[in-house]
């Protein structure tokens, strides 16, 4: 019992850190994932290509390697981040790539008639995506987002 009382403050501190990293990552990576998704769906080839490369790198390399690169690699080029910020940036960039692919799958699952109807009504692309498409996408991708958020808790 004495041992439990002795280590409890350290466990609570670790729990606080886990919650902080989870909250910061969820708050920033989901909107960034939507932006990256829309860039991935762009008709501008260079934006589409660069976004594909970003997603490929982020999803294809281990998260620990990305954290190490951001914490130890960026100071080589003069960008120094403290360990909490480096961890948060790595998590945000990593999970934004995963969320982007989830949202892209959700957008691709929407019937093309929705896009055509918005075009006939002469709605702008931003109104089409943010007013018509994304609300439907959230309903579709909600289970996948939940799974990814559970993975985020485990990763932190």
Enumerate the predicted regions with their spans.
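Transmembrane alpha-helices and adjacent helix-loop boundaries
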Residues: 1-156
């Amino acid at each position: 019992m004495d041992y439990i009382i002795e280590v409890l403050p350290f466990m609570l501190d670790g729990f606080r850190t886990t919650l902080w990293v989870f909250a910061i990552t969820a708050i920033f990576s989901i909107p960034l994932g939507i932006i990256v998704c829309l860039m991935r769906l762009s008709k501008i080839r260079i934006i589409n290509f660069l976004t594909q490369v970003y997603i490929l790198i982020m999803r294809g390399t281990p998260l620990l390697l990305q954290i190490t690169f951001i914490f130890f690699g960026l100071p080589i080029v003069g960008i120094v981040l403290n360990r909490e910020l480096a961890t948060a940036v790595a998590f945000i960039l990593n999970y934004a790539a995963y969320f982007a692919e989830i949202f892209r799958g959700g957008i691709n699952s929407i019937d093309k008639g929705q896009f055509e109807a918005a075009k006939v009504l002469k709605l702008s692309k931003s109104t089409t995506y943010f007013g018509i498409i994304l609300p439907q996408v959230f309903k579709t991708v909600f289970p996948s987002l939940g799974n990814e958020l559970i993975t985020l808790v485990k990763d932190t």
